């Protein structure tokens, strides 16, 4: 095993200029991540200078067997925390050979929204709080829980420490450092209310980069849990009963909101989000109705309400934002399995481009 570890950690730059590029894309479920690697002749820093590639879409549920080729378009580059050196991770989106985005390519439409002049002028900032649950591989039950049983009630686990309260911290810290190494603007981590559940935050990130960074952060997490022999779940309500669900609260601001007088802009934006509540809920993740019950720090899925410092609201405004008269707000509706390309671009579209 020591030899295997030595080989995995070989520093290729000592002997060659060639690098390994791991191409990442979203699979047919819209939530599963896939990747494969290729050798390049030397370091690359501009994704548009990377070659396009293809894969068998019939094996990912994205193309029929008789016409199975799907084309990968490189869109964002990150340093590879697994191979290190000059090796890279490449976030791609997916197209037909004719150049049309396939149905699971949500990045394409998001990029169009974020390139709109009105949206560009507002410099949209996002901070996404990604919650997830770590499961025992053999039984798909949260780590730290007795198999077939339950731990003590919620209360001591949120930001808790100790072997009886925090389960999987080595995975969480490994992920934190790996994301920083990769160049992802990960801003923090914490243990969540349900034992075995954790959160990391990505942001502030501008426009389309929020989606790129969150997807690659998810990819890195899945790779680390693969090594650890643990399963990561993004199910919005992995355990039924008196246990918190898992969300992806999305913090948002525009230049107008961050400037003096921005609180009035925030209130107008929230009003527009309320008018499109059903459309947003439909796009905010599968199974969200199991999470948005009006309990466990959520608003009921059929009700739109906002408030200052209210974690039972659809939209929460922070005390500092109210006091300073400018800042940001938090959309608490997105589920943990949401597509960040969809959520971030839809918030921008509804608050900037959409006219009631």
Swiss-Prot record:
Enzyme superclass (EC): ligase
Subcellular location: Cytoplasm
Catalytic activity: L-glutamate + NH4(+) + ATP = L-glutamine + ADP + phosphate + H(+)
Source organism per UniProt: Vitis vinifera
InterPro entries: Gln_synt_N, Gln_synt_N_sf, Gln_synth/guanido_kin_cat_dom, Gln_synth_cat_dom, Gln_synth_gly_rich_site, Gln_synth_N_conserv_site, Glutamine_Synthetase
This protein's UniProt keywords: ATP-binding, Cytoplasm, Ligase, Nucleotide-binding
Protein family according to the UniProt entry: Belongs to the glutamine synthetase family.
Stored PANTHER family: GLUTAMINE SYNTHETASE (PTHR20852), GLUTAMINE SYNTHETASE CYTOSOLIC ISOZYME 1-1 (PTHR20852:SF93)
EC number assigned by the record: 6.3.1.2
Subunit structure: Homooctamer.
Keyword DNA-binding recorded: no
Major site of localization recorded for this protein: cytoplasm
Domain GS beta-grasp: 19-99
GO molecular function: ATP binding; glutamine synthetase activity
GO annotations of cellular component type: cytoplasm
Protein name per UniProt: Glutamine synthetase cytosolic isozyme 2
Pfam families: Gln-synt_C, Gln-synt_N
Domain GS catalytic: start-end pairs: 106-356
